[in-house]
From Swiss-Prot:
ATP binds at G39, P40, N41, G42, G43, G44, K45, S46. It is a peripheral membrane protein. Part of an ATP-driven transport system CPn0541/CPn0542/CPn0543 for a metal. Probably responsible for energy coupling to the transport system. PANTHER family: METAL TRANSPORT SYSTEM ATP-BINDING PROTEIN TM_0124-RELATED. This is Probable metal transport system ATP-binding protein CPn_0542/CP_0210/CPj0542/CpB0563. GO terms for molecular function: ATP binding; ATP hydrolysis activity. Keywords: ATP-binding, Cell inner membrane, Cell membrane, Membrane, Nucleotide-binding, Transport. InterPro entries: AAA+_ATPase, ABC_transporter-like_ATP-bd, ABC_transporter-like_CS, Metal_Ion_Import_ABC, P-loop_NTPase. It comes from Chlamydia pneumoniae. The keyword Acetylation does not apply.
Length: 245
C-alpha cells in the first residue's frame, strides 16, 4: 500500500509559550483510504487539517505528503480542500462556473490566463457532482446542498489525489447529505479522502478507518462498532449525532 500522508510526533501551539493545541500525533494515510476525523470542539480537528494543508507549520514533529510519481504535482495542488464555511458577498453576481474555475488558480501559468484545459476541468468537476447544467446559475441563489456540491467541484477542478472536507453534510437536508456522501463514495475509487464530521450515524459506513482527535489522535480501524462506542461518549450531546433524524 502506498503512503500518501505520514505524521510522526506531531505537535502544534501558537507562540513559543502557548499550550499545545495537539501533541504526540502520529498516523499514516494510505492510497484509497476514506477516513473520518471526529472529536469534541477544541480537540484539534481543524488544526490537524490546517497542518496537512500546509497552512500551519508543526511546532514539533514532522508531516509529509507523498504525491504519485506519475502526477508530478506540487503538494499544494495534490490536495483538494472543501471548507465548512465559504465567505462571499451574496450581492456579488458570481456564477457557479467562476466559483469552480477558482479551483484552477494553482494551475495557472505565469501570465495568469485560463486555457481550454481549465474550462474542461470545470466541466468535468461539475459533472462529477451532478451540476453540469448549472454553469451560469448565480452562486448566491443556490440551496445549501447545491453550494456544498459547487465547493466540492471547486476542489475537484485541480484533479487532487487527496480530498479533505470539513463537515460537508452539516446544515443541509437529508437528501443532499446522502447525495454528497454517494458522490464521495464514487470519488474514493480514485481519490484518498479525509472528512471531518460530527454525524456518525449517516457517515460511519463510508469510512474504512476513523481518527478520533482530542488533543492527541486515536486511530480506529474497525468502524463496525463505532456508533455504539461514541454514543456513550461524554461529548455526545454537544458533538455527535448518533441516532437517526
Amino acid at each position: 500500500m502506498t503512503i500518501r500522508i505520514l505524521a510522526e510526533g506531531l505537535a502544534f501551539r501558537y507562540g513559543s509559550k502557548g499550550p499545545n493545541i495537539i501533541h504526540d500525533v502520529s498516523f499514516s494515510v494510505y492510497d484509497g483510504d476514506f477516513i473520518g476525523i471526529i472529536g469534541p470542539n477544541g480537540g484539534g480537528k481543524s488544526t490537524l487539517t490546517m497542518l496537512i494543508l500546509g497552512l500551519l507549520t508543526p511546532t514539533f514533529g514532522s508531516l509529509k505528503t507523498f504525491p504519485s510519481h506519475s502526477a508530478g504535482k506540487q503538494t499544494h495542488s495534490m490536495i483538494g480542500w472543501v471548507p465548512q464555511h465559504f465567505s462571499y458577498d451574496p450581492c456579488f453576481p458570481i456564477s457557479v462556473k467562476d466559483v469552480v474555475l477558482s479551483g484552477r488558480l494553482s494551475q495557472l501559468s505565469w501570465h495568469g490566463k485560463y486555457k481550454k484545459k481549465d474550462f474542461e476541468a470545470v466541466d468535468h468537476a461539475l459533472d462529477l457532482v451532478g451540476l453540469s447544467d448549472h454553469h451560469h446559475h448565480c452562486f448566491a441563489h443556490l440551496s445549501g446542498g447545491q453550494i456544498q456540491r459547487v465547493l466540492l467541484a471547486r476542489a475537484l477542478a485541480s484533479y487532487p489525489e487527496i480530498l479533505i472536507l470539513d463537515e460537508p453534510t452539516t446544515n443541509i437536508d437529508p437528501d443532499n447529505q446522502q447525495r454528497i456522501l454517494s458522490i464521495l463514495k464514487k470519488l474514493n475509487r480514485t481519490c484518498t479522502i479525509l472528512m471531518v464530521t460530527h454525524d456518525l450515524h449517516h457517515t460511519t459506513n463510508y469510512f474504512n478507518k476513523v481518527f478520533y482527535m482530542n488533543k492527541t489522535l486515536t486511530s480506529l480501524a474497525d468502524t463496525s462498532t463505532l456508533t455504539d462506542q461514541f454514543c456513550c461518549h461524554p461529548y455526545k450531546n454537544q458533538e455527535f449525532s448518533c441516532s437517526p433524524h
